[in-house]
Amino acid sequence: MPREIITLQCGQCGNQIGVEFWKQLCNEHNIDQEGILKNNNFLNEDRKDIFFYQADDEHFIPGALLFDLEPRVINSIQTSEYRNLYNPENMFISKEGGGAGNNWGCGYSQGHKVEEEIIDMIDREVDNSDNLEGFILSHSIAGGTGSGMGSYLLELLNDNYSKKMIQTFSVFPLLTNESSDVVVQPYNSILTLKRLILSTDSVVVIDNTSLNRIFVERLKLNNPTFQQTNTIISNVMSASTTTLRYPGSMNNDMISLISSLIINPKCHFLITSYTPITIDKHISNVQKTTVLDVMKRLLHTKNIMVSAPVRRGMYISILNIIRGETDPTQVHKGLQRIRDRKLVNFIKWNPASIQVTLAKQSPHVVSQHKVCGLMMANHTSISTLFERCVTQFDRLYKRRAFLENYKKESMFSSADGQGNFEEMESSKEITQNLIDEYKSAERDDYFTNTYI
């Protein structure tokens, strides 16, 4: 019996990533823009019903819910070549249409106002499932809708479907001192982090800073388009679900995939690495791919999609999903070579092993490389990303800068007009606790002190 997964796309970034993700899934499952299966030659080779369901006329419909507070992105989907793929009832655009103005509080409160409509949409999609396993949310934590409304969606899912898995693909903003996507992004980020910490089972962190570096260093592209950036993210999303859609002997469902990476539920933020990267006609500087080569490249800091000092921290767990022309003996040799060269620094309180799953390639997509791979890993250096979020938050908050628009929302209003920002302070404290948890995980006695 299939274990279905419902995807939620929230805000401009989340919906643009979702568009590329569904294009990728359609290609891999031989489904055209109308949802029609192109041929039945490989009908039993895959599990389309994890992400798609069939209408009465047997065309395939994505199990996707699209949310936005301004109409531009969803309107563009409705006029694109994929306009007939999605269920129009599964698209929510705010009637006000003004967006959230890059204000987490506005996005959150607008989500609360339309809670009944949102729940109806989710419940209807859940009722279409025979054996729902969980949800995947794509969003950004920087703006107003993806962060604020995205946070509200996570709380709703956690409250109403607490026994189902919740995973997110969360895009973190540029966190350099010189540049930022949105001036109030430190507030939005810290408020969203609280929900990612408390209301999810797994968060795949995608860092815009590292993506920009990968484009420049690997693809020689100084000014990538949004579509090119979103294609990389959708490739990661697609690769992470390969073993669910093309099942093999391991990690055939969401819970086994996540539980293999997350030993302590508190530390559930994952980093990724993908190789070789191909965008349009731009191919990363990789001439030959073997299992060993791909496994080594996945560990290379330049391929990791989070700006964190991976060499200084420690791996808690690693899962490699390898696709293409592979065999188990090559994997064994690759693991032995990595072990002999001491390329990985694991924490001491958990078995120091790289888990490897060999996944099937879609027969419908011609790959430019013989072997490709995705690494999903739990690594203590992710805490430095959260530290930068806290530092940027403190820099703004100590000056009480740019808080006027937040005061207009009930969560942050007060009778004296000065504003009530306990929610921000609480979010910072919870984020700091997560930072401390990851740092503690580097100690040899962490497991003993935590669980005994």
UniProtKB/Swiss-Prot annotation:
Gene3D superfamilies in UniProt: Helix hairpin bin, Tubulin/FtsZ, C-terminal domain, Tubulin/FtsZ, GTPase domain
GO-annotated molecular function: GTP binding
TM ranges: none
GO biological processes: cytoplasmic microtubule organization; microtubule nucleation
Domain of life, source organism: Eukaryota
Keywords: Cytoplasm, Cytoskeleton, GTP-binding, Microtubule, Nucleotide-binding
Gene Ontology CC terms, in alphabetical order: centrosome; cytoplasm; gamma-tubulin complex; microtubule
SMART domains: Tubulin, Tubulin_C
InterPro entries hit by this protein: Gamma_tubulin, Tub_FtsZ_C, Tubulin, Tubulin/FtsZ-like_C, Tubulin/FtsZ_2-layer-sand-dom, Tubulin/FtsZ_GTPase_sf, Tubulin_C, Tubulin_CS
SS bond partners: none
Main location: cytoplasm
Binding site residues for GTP: A142, G143, G144, T145, G146, S147, G148
UniProt-listed Pfam families: Tubulin, Tubulin_C
NAD keyword on record: no
UniProt subcellular location: Cytoplasm, Cytoskeleton, Microtubule organizing center, Centrosome
Known function: Tubulin is the major constituent of microtubules. The gamma chain is found at microtubule organizing centers (MTOC) such as the spindle poles or the centrosome, suggesting that it is involved in the minus-end nucleation of microtubule assembly.
Family: Belongs to the tubulin family.
Protein name stated in the entry: Tubulin gamma chain
Gene that encodes the chain: G-TUB
